[in-house]
Amino acid sequence: MLLYLNSTLCSIISIMYKITNVSFVEYYSNNVSKDVIYSYLMNSTCSNKGTIKLNLESGKRLKQEGPYILPPIRWLDSFEKNAEFTILCEVDDIK
């Protein structure tokens, strides 16, 4: 029984969810290039499979729909005041 639980736990832990694709639907920023955002997001660990939608409107807080990025991306909340973007990220399991 213990061996079964241990092997089950190991197989659960070995499945990781990572961002495998980043698409910029809309992007405007004076200070931060797309390359910086892309580098941060690509291969980030996530809570589960699916599509993440990140949306920031000028002067507003970041809205995130879909799986959570781990650790949370709080620094995007303090993005420059006039920045605007809509970014889609595909999350898949990496074994």
Swiss-Prot record:
Pfam families: DUF5474. This is Uncharacterized killer plasmid pGKl-2 protein 8. The lineage of its organism: Eukaryota, Fungi, Dikarya, Ascomycota, Saccharomycotina. The presence of the two linear plasmids, termed pGKL1 and pGKL2, in strains of Kluyveromyces lactis confers the killer phenotype to the host cell, by promoting the secretion of a toxin able to inhibit the growth of sensitive strains. It comes from Kluyveromyces lactis (strain ATCC 8585 / CBS 2359 / DSM 70799 / NBRC 1267 / NRRL Y-1140 / WM37) (Yeast). Keywords: Plasmid.
